[in-house]
UniProtKB/Swiss-Prot annotation:
<dbReference type="InterPro" id="IPR008135">
    <property type="entry name" value="Competence-induced_CinA"/>
</dbReference>
<dbReference type="Pfam" id="PF18146">
    <property type="entry name" value="CinA_KH"/>
</dbReference>
<comment type="similarity">
    <text>Belongs to the CinA family.</text>
</comment>
<dbReference type="InterPro" id="IPR008136">
    <property type="entry name" value="CinA_C"/>
</dbReference>
<dbReference type="Pfam" id="PF00994">
    <property type="entry name" value="MoCF_biosynth"/>
</dbReference>
<dbReference type="InterPro" id="IPR050101">
    <property type="entry name" value="CinA"/>
</dbReference>
<protein>
    <recommendedName>
        <fullName>CinA-like protein</fullName>
    </recommendedName>
</protein>
<dbReference type="InterPro" id="IPR041424">
    <property type="entry name" value="CinA_KH"/>
</dbReference>
<dbReference type="InterPro" id="IPR036425">
    <property type="entry name" value="MoaB/Mog-like_dom_sf"/>
</dbReference>
<dbReference type="InterPro" id="IPR036653">
    <property type="entry name" value="CinA-like_C"/>
</dbReference>
<dbReference type="Pfam" id="PF02464">
    <property type="entry name" value="CinA"/>
</dbReference>
<dbReference type="InterPro" id="IPR001453">
    <property type="entry name" value="MoaB/Mog_dom"/>
</dbReference>
């Protein structure tokens, strides 16, 4: 069987059991795609030497490059380096200079140097060190047999990413056959489902260069465009017309590119308009405010928020009349309108968003079922009111996340319309 591409092997029982989401594999897969390196398989193995050895031997027969994460620490369940060496009958050797470096890092960080840390200074004979500038667990670049190279990384995401950028990515560009010129771009869409988006751009999904691939997440669809060429300029020239075609067909549904988030885009538009925003949340419990404040510099346009979970707080902090609550209930368009307008009045902001709904799993009625959310966007020219019915089967967290997305997207569209 001809060997092709790159595989990812993630080590850790916590990953295998689902206790921790495997964010490292996702991040690495995106970076490999950005490099134009074919990546065909991901494997997760628990902290077990025999199974780890078997997985590595199998990979050696399929791929040219294996990237591993996890299992490089000093504890008994950190088995990766020793298991890899055993899989290819290669002795481990201590690297004195590596041991000195590990001790220096631990001491500089005010941490005691344990005898177990010394195990991190042992690598298979013939392996090169993959430096870790942020932690004590070095990785390695090792070719234990012809046409097969292993790159090992710790499982700590910040350390793994730093090592990738500083050392691994340059090595891959030089040694792994990455295209000399490769451009990748991600276009992000909301307010449209994957199937509806595919209907609009379906004929473009068959393109060979650039390729166009859709990926769906909760409330969001991404199109990844990848183009190659003999030079960076030529690769960009191949990609640009496709990007323009996609944007012409999809228009307002595309909210950003690459690392853009919907919250960041909204905040940027607010900044460009010189306007401010405040939020009043009931069923989302602060999720909208959290999404906004996760963006650095948000304080320039985000005035603040109120988590008005109870009717009393809606009355006291937002000025919602008790009679309105009695007549319509907290989950109603009149109440969210009063919340949003009261918010604008008290925060002296340009825009006010209010959300109130039945996130579930209980609390629904025939008139107001689980998954029903009322939203309001108040501005200088009036108040938009709308109801979203997300359904009970999605679950509480999904209802909350989708409510945040719909609120932000409505504000995005209003800001674009006024510019």
């Amino acid at each position: 069987m001809a060997k092709t591409g790159v595989e990812i092997l993630c080590v850790g029982t916590e990953l295998l059991l689902g206790d921790i989401l495997n964010g490292n594999a996702r991040w690495l897969a995106q970076r490999l795609a950005d490099l134009g390196l074919p990546h065909f398989r991901q494997t997760v193995v628990g902290d077990n030497t025999e199974r780890l050895m078997g997985a590595v031997r199998e990979a050696a027969g399929r791929c040219r490059i294996l990237i591993t994460t996890g299992g490089l620490g000093p504890t008994p369940d950190d088995l990766t380096t020793a298991a890899l060496a055993a899989a290819f009958d290669t002795p481990l050797e201590e690297r004195p200079e590596l041991w000195e470096e590990i001790q220096a890092k631990l001491s500089a960080g005010g941490r005691a140097v344990a005898a177990s840390n010394r195990s991190q200074a042992f690598l298979p004979i013939g392996a090169d060190v993959l430096p870790n500038s942020l932690g004590s667990a070095p990785g390695m670049i090792w070719s234990p047999c012809p046409d097969f190279t292993i790159l090992t990384f710790p499982g700590v995401p910040s350390e793994m990413r730093s090592m990738w950028v500083e050392t691994a990515e340059p090595w891959l560009r030089q040694n792994a056959g990455a295209p000399s010129a490769f451009v990748s771009r991600r276009l992000h869409f909301t307010g449209i489902g994957e199937s509806d988006l595919a209907e609009q751009v379906g004929d473009l999904l068959d393109s060979a260069n650039p390729t166009v691939a859709p990926y769906a997440a909760l409330g969001d669809v991404t199109l990844r465009l990848t183009a190659s060429g003999s030079s960076p300029g030529q690769a960009e020239a191949v990609l640009h017309p496709m990007e323009e075609q996609l944007l012409q067909r999809t228009g307002r549904f595309c909210y950003g590119r690459d690392d853009d988030t919907l919250a960041a885009v909204v905040l940027r538009l607010l900044g460009e308009a010189g306007q401010t925003l405040a939020v009043a949340e009931s069923c989302t419990g602060g999720a909208l405010g959290a999404a906004l404040t996760a963006v650095p510099g948000s304080s320039a346009v985000f005035s603040g928020g109120v988590i008005a979970y109870s009717n009393a707080v809606k009355q006291q902090l937002l000025g919602v009349p008790a009679a309105l609550l009695d007549e319509h209930g907290a989950v109603s368009e009149p109440v969210v309108k009063a919340m949003a307008e009261g918010l604008r009045s008290r925060f002296h902001c340009d825009w006010g968003i209010a959300i109130s709904g039945v996130a579930g799993p209980g609390g629904g009625t025939i008139e107001k079922p689980v998954g029903m959310v009322c939203l309001a966007l108040a501005g200088r020219e009036g108040c938009d009111l709308w109801v979203q019915r997300f359904g009970a089967r999605r679950g509480r967290s999904a209802v909350q996340q989708l409510s945040v997305i719909r609120a932000l997207d409505r504000l995005r569209l209003r800001l674009l319309a006024q510019s």
